[in-house]
Amino acid sequence: MSSPPAVVRERLDRAFQVVAGKGGVGRTLVASAIALRASQRGERVLLLEVNAPDSCARFLGVAPAPDEPREVLPNLWLCRMTPAGAMKEYALLILRFKALYTLVFENRLVKYLLRSIPSLAELTMMGKAWYHTTETLDDGSPRYTRVVVDAPATGHAMTFLSLSRIVADVVPPGVLKVAAEKMAALIESPIDSCLHLVALPEEMPVNEALELAVFSAKKLHMATGIGVMN
């Protein structure tokens, strides 16, 4: 089998890769294959599912790993992100102390308020994804050399990927603005990130993939990855 073109290899070697497309086109299968390929080449890979029904675990033939990364195969870690789990982890990163998190975020009224904030779930899950790209081992090397994100279906993927830049541009200076800027910078990195698109050879999936490609270039300023026609 011939090796892939250099531009394809370069995209598949990027540190932060997002796989997106219309629901039912095989997006999760492609994300799992990309992550498995990298892990078999010796990379330390984290595969993140965004609030999904453990499809990555099913494709890989392993047990689900909700909220916390777990090594499921050699060099391959899996984590299904949920809004509640991402909120807890992100809050603990800020508050540092679990007792303080429990006092504030487990309060019934606070929990109700948080549920009422539009798109907060997407922002905290993007924050969790960004955080995992910054983790290091004791020797200072990256804990994960690849982070592959199985994004939600097209409309939700647009929100998931665009929200950090929107928040960074509109909120006043403070902790939230700094965090959103870091998330947006990761998505917009011309060398570290890319967006892979998956479609079926049918009109609606292809149109949604093209729409997402245009949105990525004009709104997200995110590099294009590879296109997969299942």
Labelled PLM ranges:
Residues 92-133:
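ATP-hydrolysis module of ASCE/P-loop NTPase motor domains
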Residues 22:
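P-loop (Walker A) phosphate-binding loop of NTP-binding proteins
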Residues 12:
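Residues immediately N-terminal to the Walker A/P-loop in ABC ATPase nucleotide-binding domains
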